[in-house]
Amino acid sequence: MARMHSRKKGSSGSRPPVVDKLPEWCDVSKEELEKTIMTLHERGMSNAMIGLTLRDQYGVPNLKLILGKSLSSFLRDRNALPEIPEDLSNLMRKALRLRRHLLRAQPRGTVSDTSISRLPRTKDIHNKRALQLVESKIRRLVRYYKQVGRLPATWEYRPETAEIQISSKQ
């Protein structure tokens, strides 16, 4: 399968081995793990950071084998899932950084004219293109999350309000 925004072929990556039981050295109980996940979530950690912390500091090799479900499913059951999915909010942050760069670092929240063709750094064609690619990825993800039902059907990405949406949902 090809890469999304280039003409390169993809390369196959490694997969974790198929494991159906926990190793004997893992002594974390399900209740202890649930409590730890909720405390890490209350500290404001994202799903990816929770997974890394559990792996590196608590020695949890496979969260799904202990809980019986994924981290997102566990947080959804506890009504603790953020309104905007993590991958979408990361892309929105990236688009905001690029747009702010193209606007010559104006203060936060003053993105007045969002048309890419009218940005002050008109010669920075590489970052303009990067912004276009990131925003197309955002639109693609929004379409997917609407189909799945993770985002409301009326939700839409607007660069003017992206900073407010990201900061209010953290």
From Swiss-Prot:
A GO term from the CC aspect: cytosolic small ribosomal subunit
Compositionally biased region (Basic residues): 1-10
Signal peptide start and end residues: none
Record region (Disordered): 1-20
Keyword Ribosomal protein found: yes
One record GO biological process: translation
Molecular function, one GO term: structural constituent of ribosome
InterPro entries, A to Z: Ribosomal_uS15, Ribosomal_uS15_arc_euk, Ribosomal_uS15_N, uS15_NS1_RNA-bd_sf
CDD domains from the UniProt entry: S15_NS1_EPRS_RNA-bind
SUPFAM superfamilies cross-referenced by the UniProt entry: S15/NS1 RNA-binding domain (SSF47060)
UniProt keyword list: Ribonucleoprotein, Ribosomal protein
Pfam families for the chain: Ribosomal_S13_N, Ribosomal_S15
Complex formation: Part of the 30S ribosomal subunit.
Family, similarity comment: Belongs to the universal ribosomal protein uS15 family.
Entry-linked PANTHER family: RIBOSOMAL PROTEIN S15P/S13E, SMALL RIBOSOMAL SUBUNIT PROTEIN US15
Protein name: Small ribosomal subunit protein uS15
Native source species: Methanothrix thermoacetophila (strain DSM 6194 / JCM 14653 / NBRC 101360 / PT)
